[in-house]
Amino acid sequence: MNKFIICLCLFAFIHSINMDAAIKHLVSHAHTSSTGYCAAYVADALVAGGFKFTRQASAYMYRTNGILKGIGYREISKPSSFKKGDITVTDRNSAHPHGHMAMWSGSKWISDFVQRSEFVYRSNQPPVHYFRYG
């Protein structure tokens, strides 16, 4: 009986995710330039899509604390093409102590603003990690 309930709960969790709703939220709240709150904007979008997780203080923590993996994302090598809902987490460095986080809308990278590419730092570029849902 308990196994049945656990399976039912996992089924409900998996099927309650709406990536289109997450992206719609992200697109509708994006600014033209950075506000400095990339992780909060991407986290808000994930919540709008039905994801449940503990918010982190910094973007890099969504990778290092296993938050993205805990909600069904897996780390991947840089793909030849991106899929809607892919996430990048850029490591922190001395110039950017919180790192950076963004989501692929299907046509562009968006965090708290609409980006030109997945790379947001002009110099001293730390490693970028790629995550895909499912």
List each language-model region with its residue ranges.
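Sec-dependent N-terminal signal peptides
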Residues: F4-F13
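Alpha-helical structural motif
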Residues: I6, N18, D86-T88
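N-terminal capping segments
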Residues: A12-A59, H98
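Non-catalytic ligand/cofactor/substrate-binding and regulatory segments of enzyme domains
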Residues: I17-H29, R74, K84, R122-G134
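Intrinsically disordered, low-complexity segments enriched in small/polar residues
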Residues: A39, G49, S58-Y60, I71, ...
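...with weaker cross-activation on analogous glycine-rich loops/strands in unrelated enzymes
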Residues: T54-S123
